[in-house]
């Protein structure tokens, strides 16, 4: 119950809205404060009108589909859309399953991946990992298009376990080799060339003639496995529940140590991780149910000031409360540039590891960028500019 916490009702609701999206306006806060906290959580997880706004003006102002324009679409959606959590979870998966434009230079595949995260990001882990494993941007990013019988490429099989699901120390090199064999033949159709016809997406393609049909041993299981079998085994591992739930806690609740240190640094709140992993096992890895457990918990309600906003969160929150992105306009790319200047180039993370978060968002340069951006849109001078 709210009365058990040393915050007012509006403070608690504001905290929730900052974590599920980028905050809310005073009018929105007054409206949602009329219902119970548990009912608000239910509405956030299953909104009545998730697509109750139009984006047609993006096509009016921006004639092409570059990654910065789609970062702008994401920013507009999370501020104005009817399902901010869907947009927030898409960035969560983008951070965890980091895939960058700089290798492929093919924006449509990155756009397709972001839309895939929006579509499946609140479903279950098996569906999420299967969708990821069939995603052309990921297949190219981690070279699985070169993974064929007789010449296996272990890149995706390794990162699937190390960075995307289980974490370091929970599998063997033989597991990596057999996972790679299970994903042989998983590739994508060649997209239409960039010029002169423009950008076109590609699609998943399974080439049976390039798939290894041998008997395989993987994480204690044996069989003639394919990629889907490997994913089914992975999502039922206790290590996967712990790893994914710690990522969720780190993103929505409290900044943890950087991910490479997780195998030697214990979680800050083991009780919270246990609550989340229990929910993972009970719901077969359903992200919506895990988040329901998280948002309704006492430790979440008491987690104010424990999470340092990412650049995307900071810019989104500033624009939300100042009312500077209530309509689509050409200057939206300036906001995307501000996010990039603070150290987070959306759809173009620096490595497969994604971005280091928490305090590592801050250095001398990025701190100045943060302060200057917030002052630009929230100071008295900003009020004077808006009245001109």
Q: Across the structure, where does each feature detected by a protein language model lie?
A:
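N-terminal accessory alpha/beta regions
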Residues: 28-110, 116
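Activity-critical C-terminal alpha-helical subdomain
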Residues: 136-191
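Long, well-ordered, tryptophan-enriched scaffold segments
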Residues: 178-181, 185-226
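Glycine-rich, acidic and aromatic/proline-enriched surface loops and short helix-turn segments
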Residues: 83, 87-102, 134-138, 182-186, ...
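A conserved hydrophobic secondary-structure block that centers on an alpha-helix together
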Residues: 100-137
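Loop/turn elements at helix/coil->beta-strand transitions in domains of secreted/extracellular proteins
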Residues: 86-87, 123-126, 172, 241, ...
């Amino acid at each position: 119950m709210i009365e058990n916490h040393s915050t007012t009702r509006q403070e608690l609701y504001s905290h929730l809205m900052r974590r599920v999206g980028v905050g809310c306006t005073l009018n929105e806060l007054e409206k949602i404060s009329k219902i119970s906290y548990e009912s608000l959580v239910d509405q956030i997880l299953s909104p009545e009108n998730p697509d109750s706004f139009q984006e047609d003006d993006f096509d009016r102002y921006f004639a092409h589909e570059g990654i910065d324009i789609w970062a702008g679409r994401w920013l507009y959606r999370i501020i104005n859309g009817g399902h901010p959590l869907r947009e927030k979870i898409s960035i969560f998966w983008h951070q965890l399953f980091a895939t960058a434009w700089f290798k492929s230079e093919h924006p449509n595949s990155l756009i397709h991946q972001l839309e895939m995260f929006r579509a499946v990001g609140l479903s279950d882990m098996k569906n999420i990992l299967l969708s990821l494993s069939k995603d052309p941007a990921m297949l190219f990013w981690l070279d699985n298009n070169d993974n064929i019988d007789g010449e296996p490429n272990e890149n995706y099989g390794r990162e699937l376990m190390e960075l995307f699901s289980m974490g370091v120390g929970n599998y063997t090199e033989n597991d990596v080799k057999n996972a790679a064999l299970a994903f042989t033949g998983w590739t994508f159709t060649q997209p239409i060339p960039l010029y002169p016809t423009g950008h076109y997406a590609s699609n998943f393609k399974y080439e049976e003639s390039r798939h290894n049909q041998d008997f395989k041993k993987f994480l204690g299981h044996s069989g003639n496995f394919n990629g889907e079998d490997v994913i089914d085994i992975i999502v039922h591992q206790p290590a996967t529940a712990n790893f994914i739930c710690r990522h969720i806690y780190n993103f929505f609740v409290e900044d943890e140590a950087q991910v490479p240190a997780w195998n030697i640094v214990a979680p800050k709140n083991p009780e919270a991780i246990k609550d989340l992993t229990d929910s993972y096992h009970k719901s077969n890895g359903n992200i919506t149910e895990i988040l329901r457990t998280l948002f309704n918990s006492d430790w979440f309600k008491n987690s104010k000031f424990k999470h340092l906003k990412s650049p995307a969160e900071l810019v989104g929150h500033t624009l939300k409360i100042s009312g500077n992105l209530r309509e689509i306009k050409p200057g939206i790319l300036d906001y995307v540039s501000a996010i990039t200047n603070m150290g987070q180039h959306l759809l173009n993370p620096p490595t497969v590891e994604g971005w280091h978060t928490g305090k590592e968002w801050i250095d001398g340069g990025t701190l100045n960028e943060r302060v200057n951006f917030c002052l630009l849109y929230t100071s008295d001078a900003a009020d004077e500019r808006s009245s001109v």
